[in-house]
Amino acid sequence: MKTRSKLAAGFLTLMSVATLAACSGKTSNGTNVVTMKGDTITVSDFYDQVKTSKAAQQSMLTLILSRVFDTQYGDKVSDKKVSEAYNKTAKGYGNSFSSALSQAGLTPEGYKQQIRTTMLVEYAVKEAAKKELTEANYKEAYKNYTPETSVQVIKLDAEDKAKSVLKDVKADGADFAKIAKEKTTATDKKVEYKFDSAGTTLPKEVMSAAFKLDKNGVSDVVSTVDSTTYKTSYYIIKVTDKTEKKSDWKSYKNRLKEVILKDKTSDRAFQNKVISKALEKANVKIKDKAFAGILSQYATTSGSSSLKK
């Protein structure tokens, strides 16, 4: 929920700002929000005070995206899907869910709206990615594709220990599989793996090292850093089998399709391009200069005026 909360934190924190600004038919900018001896605070006073804050900027951006994508793709995400996602998160947090929502500045309905907007954007990006399934892109993906490779892996937590184990496995007559099972620090004690270049079971550095080896080849120590914990792990790899790459890309069409779609949907530049097109289609125009820059990340090279003030 933390990632999605970042998307909508401003939306709920200052939802009242957007509401006050939009309700000119019900209240005027001079309507008093607070009265006190010798002074008043009007809607306009409040709006001018908060609109330049980071939270208000994020609030307005989230509100724009919510309105635009709901208008263009609203029928593609059902309430059932939103509820399922919401309930899954709630179940994961257990009794602390209400507290987690509160700390993130969210209400149940607000979080559901956030989930809905995220799903709508994801749908739009996936549909755009499908249009990238051209023969040229298939052939390009094929060039970078390595078919299934089988390996034995020893994972270690200390560099000096890894260097010591490396000497053991490279000694004449060494039984790599036996040493791997004895020495690996992997929590599941797993040492046998199969993967292609699109796999995610092992760090990319480990897979890349494996692809460079011949059958029965043993790597040097390969170090990786966990992007979440920043912990360094050390790997020693032995390739036990390699699948020869077929000459026709169509032999891997289904797998290459997965690769292309994954690459596109996870590409921030591609995501921004899709969002930019949706904003242009909606003819979004920023009327208050305080919010002039909130859509700059989605500006296209054509410099569409719809993304400007």
Swiss-Prot record:
A GO term for molecular function: peptidyl-prolyl cis-trans isomerase activity
Residue positions of covalent lipid attachment, annotated as N-palmitoyl cysteine: C23
Membrane topology summary: Lipid-anchor
GO cellular component labels: plasma membrane
Catalysed reactions, as listed in the record: [protein]-peptidylproline (omega=180) = [protein]-peptidylproline (omega=0)
Top-level taxon: Bacteria
Key words of the record: Cell membrane, Isomerase, Lipoprotein, Membrane, Palmitate, Rotamase, Signal
Top EC class of this enzyme: isomerase
E.C. code: 5.2.1.8
One GO-annotated biological process of the protein: protein folding
Primary localization class, coarse: membrane
The keyword Signal is assigned to this record: yes
Gene3D superfamilies per record: 3.10.50.40
Localization per record: Cell membrane
Domain PpiC: 146-241
InterPro entries, per the entry: Foldase_PrsA, PPIase_dom_sf, PPIase_PpiC, PrsA_foldase, Trigger_fact/SurA_dom_sf
Lipid group attachment sites (S-diacylglycerol cysteine): C23
Signal peptide extent: 1-22
Keyword RNA-binding listed: no
Annotated function: Plays a major role in protein secretion by helping the post-translocational extracellular folding of several secreted proteins.
Family: Belongs to the PrsA family.
HAMAP family, per the entry: Foldase_PrsA
Protein name as catalogued: Foldase protein PrsA
Biological source species: Streptococcus agalactiae serotype V (strain ATCC BAA-611 / 2603 V/R)
